[in-house]
Amino acid sequence: MTTIILEVDNHTVTTRFILLGFPTRPAFQLLFFSIFLATYLLTLLENLLIILAIHSDGQLHKPMYFFLSHLSFLEMWYVTVISPKMLVDFLSHDKSISFNGCMTQLYFFVTFVCTEYILLAIMAFDRYVAICNPLRYPVIMTNQLCGTLAGGCWFCGLMTAMIKMVFIAQLHYCGMPQINHYFCDISPLLNVSCEDASQAEMVDFFLALMVIAIPLCVVVASYAAILATILRIPSAQGRQKAFSTCASHLTVVILFYSMTLFTYARPKLMYAYNSNKVVSVLYTVIVPLLNPIIYCLRNHEVKAALRKTIHCRGSGPQGNGAFSS
C-alpha cells in the first residue's frame, strides 16, 4: 500500500485514514463477516418487501404507511453507507479509506441519521393527528402535506450534513490517522485532527442539538397528547385498539433515540472505550434490521400486505389498485 502525504501550509496532510474496526483473530473476522453480511442482506430484503407491500396494496395508501415507506427506503441506504466497507475490512489487511471516501461516507451517514430523526418526529405527529383528531385527519394529512413533510425531512438532513462537512473537511489530519471505529463518524475524526477542532465541535454540537432536541420534543409532546387521549377512552378494547396503531412507531423511536443519544452523549470522549463500538453497531446495523420486524409483528395491515406481496411475487403478476388518499 502506498501512502501519499502532502505538505500544505506547514501541515502534513494525509490522503488516507486507517479504520481500526474490530481487531480480533482471523477466525473471528470471518465469523463477523458472515454475521454482518447476513444481517445486511436481510435488512435490505425486509425493507424492500415493506416498500413493495405499501406500493402494491391500496389499503396501505395512507399517510402512516407513506412515511413508513420513506423510513424503509432511508434505512436501506443508511446501512449501505456503512456495511459494505465494514465487510471488506473484515477480509482485508488494508483497512485504509481515502480522505474523499471517508468524507463521502460521513456526509451520507449524517444525512440519513438527521433525516431519520426528523422523519420519526413527523410520524409521531401523524399518529397524534390520527388519534387525537380522527375526524379532521383526512383534511389535515393530505397527500400534498405528506409530500412536503417528507421532502422537508430529506432537505433538512442534506443541509445539516453539508454544513457540518464544510467545517470537518477543512481540518488538517497529520500522517495517516488511525480512527478507532469501523466507519467514518464525526467524533473520531475530530479526535484525530492535528489542529484545534473547537469550532467544528461547536457547529456539530449546535446542529446536533437542533436536529435531536426539536424532533424529540415533537415526539414527546405528540405521545403525551396521545396517551392523554387514550386514557379518556372508556372501553379497554378501545384503548387497546388506539394504542396498537402507534405501538410499533413508539418502539422504533425508543430504540433509535436511546441508542443514538447514549452514543453521542459525550462526543469528545466516547471513543475512548471499545464498548461504544458495540452501541454503534446496535443503531447502525441491528436497529435497521429490527424496525421492519417490529412493524410486521405489531401491525396486522402490514403483515397482511406482506403476505399478499410475497404470494403475488411468487405466483406471478397480479392486478393492483391505484394510489388513493
Swiss-Prot record:
Pfam families: 7tm_4 (PF13853)
Membrane-crossing residue ranges in chain numbering: 31-51, 60-80, 105-125, 145-165, 203-222, 243-263, 277-297
Sections of the chain in a coiled coil: none
Keyword annotations from UniProtKB, A to Z: Cell membrane, Disulfide bond, G-protein coupled receptor, Glycoprotein, Membrane, Olfaction, Receptor, Sensory transduction, Transducer, Transmembrane, Transmembrane helix
Subcellular location: Cell membrane
InterPro entries the UniProt entry points to: GPCR_Rhodpsn, GPCR_Rhodpsn_7TM, Olfact_rcpt
GO cellular component: plasma membrane
Residue positions with a glycan: 10, 191
GO MF entries: G protein-coupled receptor activity; olfactory receptor activity
GO process terms (BP): detection of chemical stimulus involved in sensory perception of smell
Membrane topology according to the record: Multi-pass membrane protein
SS bond list: 102-194
Extracellular side: 1-30, 81-104, 166-202, 264-276
CDD domains, A to Z: 7tmA_OR6B-like
UniProt topological domain (Cytoplasmic) ranges: 52-59, 126-144, 223-242, 298-325
Reported function: Odorant receptor.
Record family assignment: Belongs to the G-protein coupled receptor 1 family.
Protein name: Olfactory receptor 6Y1
Biological source species: Homo sapiens (Human)
Organism taxonomic ancestry: Eukaryota, Metazoa, Chordata, Craniata, Vertebrata
Gene name of the encoded protein: OR6Y1
